[in-house]
């Protein structure tokens, strides 16, 4: 089924009709919603949380910085998106948004959506994701098309945003063949030895730059637990830990972020706007291998909610978390008549 995506003309027309003095910022009630909506409220925007369950809605209603909490059927999100347009709202997407509503609906939703919406289509395919990273010229793990090519330990990843669920390691091709039986869509990657590091970036059309904003480590069950070799390791993300990088690594990490932003514009055809993440392993020789990306805000940015990221102060001379950074960009774009540079 070919999905064309939201009509850019309709999105542009919606933005032109919006009252920029009364903009609302909306997001799905999960993932980084608290951070996004808190930041939006601090910058003077009305805020809307869209929940898929009544119990989630009840939880989000307790926070005074959220003006409205809606309950929606995510199986028909286009209808909710139309209501958001009527509410003069823009949508900030995150990983749970794409997982809950599905990438096809995320492409079709008529509400102005932060960032390069077409990138969602690429993120639905693990092979296209690796193609984009390679096009960016960042070092990546080797990808194997068949088990017969495998000559070292590998990790198998399922397609889609699943928080690491269903991923597994295989030590050799025999183990790999056995465990691939009956699996859906997946990619086989070289398993890189080192420590994980996830880099948060912000691409700013308003300021014409890519900012390196912070970093985190994922806390995964059960690979990070006390399993003592008794169970097969799994990689389900349950939380995130803060990470301050060696300063000598920052120029390389920033360069990779810039190269990735350029590759998206060239290959996907739309400019990155807002937060994104490159996910990597750092080896003991300090070399970096980037194995994954997210084209929007990642949950790891929650580690500095309310405190500000360790690097935001370098750009603005005051700490700012990613929710506040998004709101700052929206406010400045609205003031300068440049909302169309942020939303697709």
From Swiss-Prot:
Residues annotated as binding Mg(2+): 279, 292
Keywords assigned by UniProt, alphabetized: ATP-binding, Ligase, Magnesium, Manganese, Metal-binding, Nucleotide-binding, Purine biosynthesis
Recorded metabolic or biological pathway in which this protein acts: Purine metabolism; IMP biosynthesis via de novo pathway; 5-formamido-1-(5-phospho-D-ribosyl)imidazole-4-carboxamide from 5-amino-1-(5-phospho-D-ribosyl)imidazole-4-carboxamide (formate route): step 1/1
One GO MF term attached to the UniProt entry: ligase activity, forming carbon-nitrogen bonds
Keyword Magnesium: yes
Residues that bind 5-amino-1-(5-phospho-beta-D-ribosyl)imidazole-4-carboxamide: 31, 96, 240
EC number(s) recorded for this UniProt protein: 6.3.4.23
Required cofactor(s): Mg(2+); Mn(2+)
Record: residues binding ATP: 153-198, 220
Domain ATP-grasp as annotated: residue spans: 130-324
Cofactor binding note from Swiss-Prot or TrEMBL: Binds 1 Mg(2+) or Mn(2+) ion per subunit.
Taxonomy, superkingdom: Archaea
Catalytic activity: 5-amino-1-(5-phospho-beta-D-ribosyl)imidazole-4-carboxamide + formate + ATP = 5-formamido-1-(5-phospho-D-ribosyl)imidazole-4-carboxamide + ADP + phosphate
GO biological process: 'de novo' IMP biosynthetic process
Keyword Manganese: yes
Family the entry assigns: Belongs to the phosphohexose mutase family.
Its biological purpose: Catalyzes the ATP- and formate-dependent formylation of 5-aminoimidazole-4-carboxamide-1-beta-d-ribofuranosyl 5'-monophosphate (AICAR) to 5-formaminoimidazole-4-carboxamide-1-beta-d-ribofuranosyl 5'-monophosphate (FAICAR) in the absence of folates.
Protein name listed in UniProt: 5-formaminoimidazole-4-carboxamide-1-(beta)-D-ribofuranosyl 5'-monophosphate synthetase
Organism whose genome encodes this protein: Pyrobaculum neutrophilum (strain DSM 2338 / JCM 9278 / NBRC 100436 / V24Sta)
Lineage of origin: Archaea, Thermoproteota, Thermoprotei, Thermoproteales, Thermoproteaceae
């Amino acid at each position: 089924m070919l999905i064309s995506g939201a009509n850019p003309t309709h999105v542009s027309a919606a933005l032109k009709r919006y009252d920029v003095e009364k903009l609302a910022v909306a997001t799905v009630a999960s993932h980084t919603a608290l951070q996004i909506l808190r930041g939006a409220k601090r910058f003077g925007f009305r805020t809307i949380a869209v929940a898929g369950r009544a119990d989630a809605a009840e939880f989000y209603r307790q926070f005074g910085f959220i003006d409205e909490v809606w309950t929606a059927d995510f199986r028909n999100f286009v209808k909710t998106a139309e209501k958001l347009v009527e509410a003069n709202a823009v949508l900030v997407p995150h990983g749970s948004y794409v997982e809950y509503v599905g990438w096809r609906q995320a492409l079709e939703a008529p509400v102005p959506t932060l960032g390069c919406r077409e990138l969602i289509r690429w993120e639905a395919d693990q092979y296209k994701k690796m193609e984009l990273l390679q096009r960016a010229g960042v070092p990546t793990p080797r990808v194997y098309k068949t088990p017969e090519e495998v000559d070292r330990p590998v990790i198998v990843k399922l397609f889609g945003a699943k928080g690491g669920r269903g991923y597994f390691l295989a030590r050799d091709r025999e183990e790999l063949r056995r465990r691939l039986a009956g699996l859906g869509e997946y990619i086989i990657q070289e398993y890189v030895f080192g420590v994980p590091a996830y880099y948060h970036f912000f691409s700013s059309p308003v300021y014409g730059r890519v900012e390196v904003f912070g970093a985190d480590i994922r806390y995964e069950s059960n690979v990070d637990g006390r399993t003592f070799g008794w169970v097969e390791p799994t990689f389900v993300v349950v939380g995130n830990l803060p990470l301050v990088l060696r300063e000598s690594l920052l120029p390389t990490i920033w360069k990779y972020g810039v190269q990735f932003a350029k590759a998206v514009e060239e290959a996907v055809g739309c400019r990155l706007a807002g937060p994104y993440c490159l996910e990597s392993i750092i080896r003991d020789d300090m070399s970096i291998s980037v194995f994954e990306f997210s084209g929007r805000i990642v949950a790891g940015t929650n580690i500095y909610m309310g405190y500000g990221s360790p690097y935001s102060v370098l750009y603005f001379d005051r700490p700012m978390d990613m929710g506040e950074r998004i709101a700052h960009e929206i406010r400045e774009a609205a003031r300068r008549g440049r909302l169309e540079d942020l939303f697709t």
